[in-house]
UniProtKB/Swiss-Prot annotation:
It catalyses: L-aspartate + 2-oxoglutarate = oxaloacetate + L-glutamate. The gene is aspC. It is found in: Cytoplasm. Homodimer. The modification N6-(pyridoxal phosphate)lysine is found at residue 236. It comes from Streptomyces virginiae. The lineage of its organism: Bacteria, Bacillati, Actinomycetota, Actinomycetes, Kitasatosporales. Its EC number is 2.6.1.1. One of its GO terms (molecular function) is pyridoxal phosphate binding. This is Aspartate aminotransferase. One of its GO terms (cellular component) is cytoplasm.
Length: 397
């Protein structure tokens, strides 16, 4: 067994989701808050485009490894429309979902030992992708007192002569935090000042609520353009997690290197999925607006219910579809004869006792928290959090 591959952990979020689905298939009334996956079907016009593509013989064959030219052009146009960032189709690589985009982006720019500053809490895939690419993730931790947002001062304290990249994610998975325009600009200017690469994940760009606003970092800080990599995809915006279409936007030399890698790893993304993605990014955002309205309603319900639990504090997320409550005050307390000492143990207790699946903060680099997705039906959401409320109300010193 390769030591490098053997050291990689499985996706904790997918593991929790798989366990919940297995229990449900066995007849258990499990409610799963583990998956970051919209509960809506993919819009019909996207599905119909895929059906037509299935019948078109030209999509039965190999196509360019870097993506269908028409999809790359549409992604460039969509990027200008949605964020104001102007790029050429030659700066786009179409990938098998956002995970491949992230790995290939890091692989294209990292040499062994290069450091990547990773704000925590972070999505589980980031540090593992960095390690696979030969880099070293360096955590910079923010907590609920700052809304899980790191400061320039924290980033500067983590910077060394080996630092090559800073990761920037807004809206965030797992916390739902969104950086203000001023704070995002300050981080971008700091990165530009020190000649760092920035990898920014914009997968949740359309899922922001209230007064929060999505802003694309290279638009705020044009000086970053030559050292900025954007990863994005159709999964979250268009309820297309299973279609597996993401993309990288980067300087052309990065795209060429990443495309070469992909040509040997997977070749082109499924043509049918690419045609579906073309319909998605070329269409209007009406379906997205409806989904966002539902997520916003669920967000408010979940946060209110979580904050009614003694020992739980949940900042209000401003984007994505996750709540990230602190449960540190509950650790060590007795609950149904057990004293969970970690959020891993507490999450296991919640699943065992009330059949609700949540993801522990250890998966995101910050023990003492739980991540709950509110991308599920309203009734299931209320029932699931109610079960958690009743269980945790039994906590005693």
């Amino acid at each position: 067994m390769s030591a490098r591959i053997g050291a990689i952990s499985e996706s904790a979020t997918l593991a929790v989701d798989a366990k919940a689905k297995a229990l449900k298939a066995a007849g258990r009334p499990v409610i799963g808050f583990g998956a970051g996956e919209p509960d809506f079907p993919t819009p019909d016009y996207i599905v119909e485009a895929a059906v037509e593509a299935c019948r078109n013989p030209k999509y039965h064959r190999y196509t360019p490894a870097g993506g269908l030219p028409e999809l790359k052009a549409a992604i460039a146009a969509k990027t200008l429309r949605d964020s104001g960032y102007e790029v050429e189709a030659s700066q786009v690589l179409v990938t098998n979902g956002g995970k491949q985009a992230i790995y290939e982006a890091f692989a294209a720019i990292l040499d062994p030992g290069d450091e990547v500053i990773v704000p925590a809490p972070y999505w589980t895939t980031y540090p593992e992708s960095i390690r696979l690419a030969g880099g070293v993730p360096v955590d910079v931790v923010a907590d609920e007192t700052t809304g899980y947002r790191v400061s320039v001062e924290q980033l500067e304290a983590a910077r060394t002569e080996r630092t090559k990249v800073v990761l920037f994610v807004s809206p965030s998975n797992p916390t739902g935090s969104v950086y203000s325009e001023a704070d995002a600009k300050a981080i971008g200017e700091w990165a530009a000042e020190h000649g760092l690469w920035v990898l920014t994940d914009e997968i949740y760009e359309h899922l922001v609520y209230g007064e929060a606003k999505f802003t694309s970092l290279p638009v705020l800080v044009p000086a970053l353009r030559d050292k900025c990599i954007i990863v994005n995809g159709v999964a979250k915006t268009y309820a297309m997690t299973g279609w597996r279409v993401g993309w990288v936007i980067a300087p052309q030399d990065v795209i060429k290197a990443a495309t070469n890698l992909q040509s040997h790893a997977t070749s082109n993304v499924s043509n049918v999925a690419q045609v579906a993605a073309l319909a998605a990014v070329s269409g209007n955002l009406d379906a997205v607006a409806e989904m966002r309205k539902a997520f916003d309603r669920r967000r408010q319900t979940m946060v209110k219910m979580l904050n009614e639990i003694d020992g739980v504090f949940c900042p209000t997320p401003e984007g994505a579809f996750y709540a990230y409550p602190s449960v540190k005050e509950l650790l060590g307390k007795e609950i149904r004869g057990k004293r969970p000492q970690s959020s891993v143990e507490l999450a296991a207790l919640i699943l065992d006792e009330v059949e609700v699946a949540v993801v522990p903060g250890e998966a995101f680099g910050t023990p003492g928290y739980l991540r709950l997705s509110y991308a599920l039906g309203d009734e299931d959401l209320v029932e699931g959090v109610s079960r958690i409320q009743k269980l945790l109300a039994e906590a005693k010193a």
